[in-house]
């Protein structure tokens, strides 16, 4: 019974999610240069992924198909969880915070 559960519930309603597989916040600190993480899938379970950007910065999310999404506050991107993606660090703000939800 996390005090943050109600925040996640708001997103679940918007996403019309029936089940949460995993929900987590990713927090990264400012770096001297932008660094890429590794391409990955969040879960092998057939599902969808939503990434909600909580602040604007020059970090991005890249997809294996070469498309990318800029970190803009209040932006959400959703995609099939089988699609490989990666995040980057950032250089222009103290931190980068995203909410990552895997759901059905």
Labelled PLM ranges:
Residues 1-76, 82, 86-97, 102-104:
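Fe(II)/2-oxoglutarate oxygenase catalytic core
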């Amino acid at each position: 019974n996390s005090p943050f559960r109600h925040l996640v519930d708001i997103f679940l309603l918007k996403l019309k999610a029936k089940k949460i597989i995993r929900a987590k916040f990713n927090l990264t600190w400012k770096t001297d240069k932008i660094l890429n993480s590794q391409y990955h899938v969040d879960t092998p379970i057939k599902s969808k992924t939503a990434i909600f950007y909580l602040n604007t910065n020059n970090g991005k999310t890249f997809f294996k198909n070469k498309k990318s999404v800029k970190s803009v506050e209040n932006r959400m991107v959703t995609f099939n969880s089988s699609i490989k993606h990666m995040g980057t660090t950032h250089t222009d703000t103290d931190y980068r915070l995203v909410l990552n939800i895997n759901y059905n």
